C-alpha cells in the first residue's frame, strides 16, 4: 500500500488509536484456532468499514498475524488481504458501491485451480462496537446493524472501549476448490454462507431483544398454566380473582430479572479495574466449545459448581469477554437485599426461593418464567448444588431447576437446550473462614449490606482464578438415547411429570457433577495444601515439598484425570514461590534451608483448597495407601481392594470411571508410580521402594481420612447389623467427631452430615444394607477387615472401643 491510501489510513488511525481499545476473541488467535502463519491468510469482514479494518489491523499486529493492509502476492497476482461481504450503507443511502466480495472470492478460488500447491486460509472476522440487544419495542432497525459513516463515528466515540474483534476458525480455500470447484456460483455460495455465519455470530454475542418488563408479565399472566394457578389460588385462599392475580404479579416482580446492557457495561469496567488488582490472572479453558454452541443456535444452560458469591460475577465477566451474552442467573432469594438485589437483577439475576413446597402459585409462576426465558432464546445459569460448598467438594445436586429445564423442553420448543458444566476454582475464597465456622455449628449469618462491605474490605491478593468449561450435555440427544419415547410427553400448555422424568433428571444431575469434576483445575494453592496437610506436622522442608509437588504434577500430567482437567505448566519450585506470596504459609529458615509450615489456625481453612482437587488424586492416593500398608501386593489383590472401595469413592467424589475401566486406570497409574521410583513393578507385583517411601506415604495420606471414615461406618454396621440408616449416620458422625479430637484430624468434612448420608445411601445401593435395614454381616466384616489393615492401629482401637460396653 502506498500513496494516498497509506496517508488516509494513518490519519484515520490517529483518533481510533485513542478511542478504541478492543479485545481479541480468542485471546491468542493463532494457536487457539490453529492458524498457520507460514501459509497465506486472508480476512473476511461483514461490512465495508475502515474503522473495523483498522481495529482488526491493530489486533493482527498485536498477535503476530499478517497485516490486513498488506496485499497478498500469489503467482505474480496482487490481491487484497481482506474482503468485505457487504458494501455497507453510506450517509446517502441511495448511493451504494458495487459489492466486490464475489469477484474477489472467485479470483482467490481461480488461483487455487491453477496452482495445486496453494492453500489460502480464509479467516472470518467480526468487529463489534457495543453489544446492546435493544428492546422489543421502539427500535426499527436490528441491533448491530450496518452503520453509515456518521453512525459509525458515534459508535466508535461512545463504545470504542467496549469493542472486540472475534476471529473464527479458518476455512481452507484449497478444500473449497477441490470439493466444490472454482466457478462463480461457488464464490456466490461462499459469500452467502459468510453472511449467515456473521448473522449467527451477532446473535451469539448480543442475544435476542429484551422485552419490556410489563409486556413480559402480561404474557405470563395470559398463559393457561398461570391463569389456572390464579383460579386455584383464589379458590383455595377464598380471595377475589383480582387479588390472586395481584399475588401472581407480586411473585413475578420478586422473581424476574431486569436485564440492562448499560449496567453490564458499567460493571464490566468496575470488575475489570478491580480484578486486575485482586487477581493475578483469570484462566479460561475450552470456551471455544461454548462459542460454537451459541453460534449453532443452542439454548445454553450454564451449570457451574458453587464455591463463592464471586461465582455470579466471575462467570458473567468471563462470558462477556469471550464474546457471549451474559446469562440470566438463578440467584438465591437471600441475595435480594438493597442495594445488591437491584444491581444483580439488572445484571441478569432472577431470584429463587429455597423451597417451592406448599406454594403452587409460586412454583407455576417460576416454571413459566423459566420456560419463557428458554423460548425467547436467553442463556440461563443456575447452580445445581443449590448453595455454596462449605467443604470445597461438590455437594449432592438439587434437581428442582434441572427438572423444570426438561419440563421446558416438553412444552415443544424448537431450540435445542444444551447443559454446559463449568468448574470454577480459586486460590483464595473470601468466605472460607465463615464456612469453617458454619461446619463447626455456627448459625449462617444472613446476607446483608454490612456483611457484603465486610467481605469486600477483606479482599486482598486473590491469586489466580480458573473457569474451565466441561463437556456439554445436549438434552435432546440425551433424551433420544435414554428415553426414546420422550416426545410423547410434549404438552405446550400443562407442566407434565411423566414417569421417566425423576430418574432421568437424577441421572443427568449425577452426570453433570462428574463432568464438572472432569474439568477440575489443579493450581499452586491446592497442590501445596494437599502436600502440607498430608504431613502429620503440617510442615515440610522446601526440598520435600518440591519433591511432593513433582510427584503430583507428574501423576496429573502423565496420567491425566480427564481430557478437560487442567494442570499448571509451571515447575514445582515456581508454584511454591507463587503459593508463598498468598501469605497462607509460614517459612522458618535455618542453616540447612527453609521449612514451610501450615499454621494450626490455617490448617482447617486450607482443607477447603485440598478438597477442590481431592477427586483428581484420590485413586493414586488409595493405591499408595494399599501398597504402603502391605509393603508388597499383587496386581490382582490391589485391584480387588480398589474395586471394593471404589463405589463409595465414586459416589462421594463424583469420579468419572466405571468399574470396568478401573484395571486400565490402575495399570497406568502403577506404571507412572514405578517410573517415579515410588514403587517397583515386577511380575505383576507392586512393592514399596524404601528410598522414596516418604513421598509415597505423603501421597497415601490423601486417602487416609476417607479410609478412616469408611472404617467407622463398616465397623458400626458389622457390630450391629440391625442398625437403621438414620442411627448408622448419627453414630458414624459421633465416632468421627471423637476420632477427630483424639487424633487431631482438622478436616471439617470428616464428620460432615452430608458425607455420611451419601455413604450410607451407597452402602444400600451396593447391598451392604438391605431394604429391610439388615446388613450382610459376613460381607460387611470382610470390608472392615480390609479397611482395618489400611489404617493405623491407634485409630483402629479408637473406632472399635467406641461400641464397647453398649
UniProtKB/Swiss-Prot annotation:
A motif (HXXXXD motif) lies at residues 305-310. Its EC number is 2.3.1.15. It is found in: Cell inner membrane. It catalyses: sn-glycerol 3-phosphate + an acyl-CoA = a 1-acyl-sn-glycero-3-phosphate + CoA. GO terms for cellular component: plasma membrane. GO terms for molecular function: glycerol-3-phosphate O-acyltransferase activity. It comes from the Bacteria. Keywords: Acyltransferase, Cell inner membrane, Cell membrane, Lipid biosynthesis, Lipid metabolism, Membrane, Phospholipid biosynthesis, Phospholipid metabolism, Transferase. Its main location: membrane. The keyword Transmembrane helix does not apply. Pathway: Phospholipid metabolism; CDP-diacylglycerol biosynthesis; CDP-diacylglycerol from sn-glycerol 3-phosphate: step 1/3. It is an enzyme of class 2 (transferase). HAMAP family: Glyc3P_acyltrans (MF_00393). PANTHER family: DIHYDROXYACETONE PHOSPHATE ACYLTRANSFERASE, GLYCEROL-3-PHOSPHATE ACYLTRANSFERASE. Belongs to the GPAT/DAPAT family. This is Glycerol-3-phosphate acyltransferase. It comes from Escherichia fergusonii (strain ATCC 35469 / DSM 13698 / CCUG 18766 / IAM 14443 / JCM 21226 / LMG 7866 / NBRC 102419 / NCTC 12128 / CDC 0568-73).
